[in-house]
């Protein structure tokens, strides 16, 4: 390796491209490894950097949406990829959609022309001793995964995610739902779960819809998901299987699985429900709850309808939809600092989906922070930890402090931000505007000295 390169970046996806650019802009010489086109992932189609392999939408660009706030922060911090996306944007209402080929071309051109970035088109299977950013993405190669396992242990590297939908607490109808833990007999403890009870008839409607709901087609290398896989923490997600697959095993399969009612009594009726959907607290603030055992591959429109069939969630606000797919990611709560620095090796950083963030823009954001901090480390400057009041800071804090029992990839949403203390109660849109204003003010104060 050329010793004039001070920083190695592994992966030329969204996070790696942004990280390389940010470090180079700080005066650091960067060696960027990308194995395509000589090594393929099974999902990518081209050799371009920052290829979008799923949707061509980067989510809402409205200033009072979580994704819009994240983009506003990236603009303030000089994101290359966001600038490229806006250059080739397409009409998409309030969303930022792009011409995917032109987007990747612009990013590739910018990286190739940067005087301090060298691209090396080959697979890297050993983690270098030099200052390094690992941004190898959800389809990290087998060879690099082996090196990661040797470094962090097999229990801290996952190959599938099993994401259950998350709803906001404020949208749960507690006159229908109730708090309880199974077999609870005390009087003081109100229970750790919110339970949505179903009658026999309600379950029949729910089951029939689930049985006929349309699922996302799996890629060839994701076929194992149909039979259950280890996804996320092995202690909690061994043998994860989509809820729609369980339903196809028989009408009562769910009643002996995630919807089992045993040990629960509905205080509104004094009887045991026929079926129960349990919601588990997902963040320390208690503003988000996930649907226990509801990992799914159903299309988003189908998920929305089926969640609205659950008593107590008729008006449920879904802040994250469920999914199960091939996704290499590390157990960040035990391994990373919010600066994206590896705890056990000061000159190693991670960025992108491998850290446990979800979505294009979140990947760009963590890549940006990793690139800045790797450069700051090399320049003997203090690392930048963004405040939790910013969306980037909140995401980085969440993935590095999440509760182990519920650790799964997370996207930008208002539920991970600290609550705003105000004199009067705000409606949903007013609260979103307040979050956006606070984010802008806090971020400006944090980066003005950079």
Feature roles, as predicted:
Residues 14, 18, 44, 65, ...:
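Conserved active-site and cofactor/substrate-binding residues in soluble primary-metabolism enzymes
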Residues 37, 354, 373-450:
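Glycine- and aromatic-enriched mobile tails/lids
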Residues 61-108, 112:
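A conserved beta-strand/loop capping segment in the N-terminal third of enzymes
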Residues 110-305:
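Predominantly flavin-linked oxidoreductase catalytic cores and closely associated redox partners
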Residues 3-15:
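Beta1/beta-strand and adjacent pyrophosphate-binding region of the FAD-binding site
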Residues 21-83, 388-399:
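N-terminal FAD cofactor-binding segment of flavoenzymes
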Residues 291-357, 364-366, 384-402, 409-411, ...:
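A glycine-rich dinucleotide-binding beta-alpha-beta segment and adjacent secondary-structure elements
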Residues 362-377:
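An active-site-proximal "capping" alpha-helix that borders the catalytic cofactor pocket
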């Amino acid at each position: 390796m050329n010793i004039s390169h001070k920083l190695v970046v592994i992966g030329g996806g969204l996070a790696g491209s942004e990280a390389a650019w940010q470090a180079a802009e700080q005066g650091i010489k960067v060696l960027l490894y990308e194995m395509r086109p000589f090594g393929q992932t099974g999902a990518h189609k081209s050799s371009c950097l920052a290829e979008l392999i799923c949707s061509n939408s980067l989510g809402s660009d409205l200033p009072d949406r979580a994704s819009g706030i994240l983009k506003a922060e990236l603009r303030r911090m000089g994101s290359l990829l966001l600038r490229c996306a806006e250059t080739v944007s397409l009409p998409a209402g309030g969303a930022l959609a792009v011409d995917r080929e032109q987007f990747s071309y612009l990013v590739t051109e910018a990286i190739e022309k940067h005087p301090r970035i060298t691209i090396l088109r080959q697979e890297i299977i050993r983690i270098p001793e030099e200052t390094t950013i690992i941004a190898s993405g959800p389809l990290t190669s087998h060879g690099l995964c082996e090196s990661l396992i040797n470094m962090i242990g097999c229990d801290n590297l996952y190959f599938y995610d099993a994401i259950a939908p998350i709803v906001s607490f404020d949208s749960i109808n507690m006159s229908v739902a109730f708090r309880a833990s199974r077999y609870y007999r005390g009087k003081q403890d109100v229970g750790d779960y919110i339970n949505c009870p179903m009658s026999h008839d309600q379950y029949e409607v729910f089951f029939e819809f689930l049985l006929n709901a349309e699922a996302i087609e799996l890629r060839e290398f994701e076929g194992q998901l149909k039979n259950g896989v280890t996804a996320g923490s092995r202690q909690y997600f061994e043998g994860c299987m989509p809820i729609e697959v369980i339903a196809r095993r028989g009408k009562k399969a769910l009643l002996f699985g995630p919807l089992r009612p045993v040990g629960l009594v509905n205080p509104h009726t004094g009887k045991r429900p026929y079926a129960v959907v349990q919601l588990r607290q997902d963040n320390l603030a208690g503003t988000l709850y996930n649907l226990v055992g509801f990992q799914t591959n159903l299309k988003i429109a189908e998920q929305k309808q089926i969640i609205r069939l659950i008593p107590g969630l008729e008006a449920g606000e879904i802040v994250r939809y469920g999914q199960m797919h091939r996704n290499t990611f590390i157990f960040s709560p035990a391994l990373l600092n919010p600066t994206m620095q590896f705890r056990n090796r000061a000159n190693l950083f991670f960025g992108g989906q491998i850290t446990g963030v979800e979505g294009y823009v979140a990947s760009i954001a963590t890549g940006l922070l990793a690139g800045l901090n790797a450069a700051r480390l090399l320049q003997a400057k203090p690392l930048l930890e963004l405040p939790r009041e910013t969306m980037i800071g909140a995401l980085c804090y969440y993935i590095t402090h999440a509760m182990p029992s519920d650790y799964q990839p997370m996207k930008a949403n208002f539920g991970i931000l600290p609550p705003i203390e105000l004199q009067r109660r705000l409606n949903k849109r007013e609260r979103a505007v307040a979050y956006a204003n606070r984010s802008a003010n806090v971020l400006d104060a944090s980066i003005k000295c950079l």
